[in-house]
């Protein structure tokens, strides 16, 4: 079993700080990173989205194609530009983002661009695709379509507040997406935002009760991962590494998670979930040991050295 993992959203050119004020061009965008991450782990991934019919867009499509991602539903839009983001790193390798193109081509995806989903497949989405029309309606349609076909939805909000002028709309979109997701991955900050509580145990209980995902994961960086699964709650320790750049850590974690779930199916209990989370955490940790998001995503051979 190696079910297809579709990833819908933005493919972005990240501009990362280099020496003497120079910027390094790197392929990125959380959905594109996840699609590549799954493919590098031997999974079957496809990207659904639009990039500009410009040099950056052609570069991103070529990059994903070279990484063995199915790009048959990755479109070049001559009317709009590819999303471009300046990433700023602090001394600890933590980052902030400045979006240079708005609205970018990815936000103009329409329902006619969607593939025919099939039973057993996965669809992974983030909230940037929900931040504007027509992408918002297209994303919700994709989530409904794959669930109707017998597939599952994975949702990582990956909230970027500066892309939302209306916080009430952000909350409404998050609420709708969370109701449709089988697997939810949140950062600690996102859990606090969604649950309106700094108490993580309360926040997890609140989210699981309201949305009832099959699996809820809360990533806490060096503090590990909290998991709520089959009415049980547990903590998994992080793998200690020397971090250089955290840009792609969350995406690598999701890629490892989805690659394992697509290959092995949903675990039957918390004990069976442990190898999947170990793989996901190892992917996330390895991705912080090099600069860039996509460039740092691990290959299967990198994992083989870890186990």
Swiss-Prot record:
Single GO biological process annotation from the record: fructose metabolic process
Pfam families: PfkB (PF00294)
Statement: the UniProt record of this protein carries the keyword Iron: no
GO molecular function per UniProt: ATP binding; fructokinase activity
Catalytic activity, EC: 2.7.1.4
The family this protein is said to belong to: Belongs to the carbohydrate kinase PfkB family.
Protein name from the UniProt record: Fructokinase
Species of the source: Salmonella typhimurium
